[in-house]
Amino acid sequence: MAGTIEALVPGGQATPGPPLGPELGPTPVDVQDVVAQINDETAAFDGMEVPVTVEYDDDGSFTIEVGVPPTAELIKDEAGFETGSGEPQVDFVADMSIEQVKKVAEQKSTDLLAYDVKNAAKEVGGTCASLGVTIEGEDARTFDDRVDAGDYDDVLDE
């Protein structure tokens, strides 16, 4: 490969403008073709920020690798809000069910350090706490303790 470009683009809505256009402009690839393929491959993440890597050759050929959106983006999409809280320990913006937390954990499982769904859910819980999202009506900062106590084994062990 002659070069690699990494960018965070809105799923299904990439354009030839920034951040892709200025990076791809001086390369031998057709910018419109790259943008079209990125939009096709990221359509399932419509509106979410998605990491993409474009590798290209001197002959104009290219390959695109689409990553999983950041955990915060998946949480925002699942819980239905646009921005986190300015005071996440005081002002809560949304509440998620344990099933929703599990869904996000499973979506992110390839990018997380956790070795099972329970620990992946605990990582998601940490992000919920920083965004001002409660889990099952409780402060997300206590989620780890509740998982360790087995409160959610019926859902997380499935």
From Swiss-Prot:
CDD domains: Ribosomal_L11 (cd00349). Residues 1-28 are annotated as: Disordered. Keywords: Ribonucleoprotein, Ribosomal protein, RNA-binding, rRNA-binding. InterPro entries: Ribosomal_uL11, Ribosomal_uL11_C, Ribosomal_uL11_C_sf, Ribosomal_uL11_CS, Ribosomal_uL11_N, Ribosomal_uL11_N_sf. One of its GO terms (biological process) is translation. SMART domains: RL11 (SM00649). GO terms for cellular component: large ribosomal subunit. GO terms for molecular function: large ribosomal subunit rRNA binding; structural constituent of ribosome. HAMAP family: Ribosomal_uL11 (MF_00736). PANTHER family: 60S RIBOSOMAL PROTEIN L12, LARGE RIBOSOMAL SUBUNIT PROTEIN UL11M. Belongs to the universal ribosomal protein uL11 family. Part of the ribosomal stalk of the 50S ribosomal subunit. Interacts with L10 and the large rRNA to form the base of the stalk. L10 forms an elongated spine to which L12 dimers bind in a sequential fashion forming a multimeric L10(L12)X complex. Forms part of the ribosomal stalk which helps the ribosome interact with GTP-bound translation factors. NCBIfam families: PRK01143.1. This is Large ribosomal subunit protein uL11. It comes from Halorubrum lacusprofundi (strain ATCC 49239 / DSM 5036 / JCM 8891 / ACAM 34). The lineage of its organism: Archaea, Methanobacteriati, Methanobacteriota, Stenosarchaea group, Halobacteria.
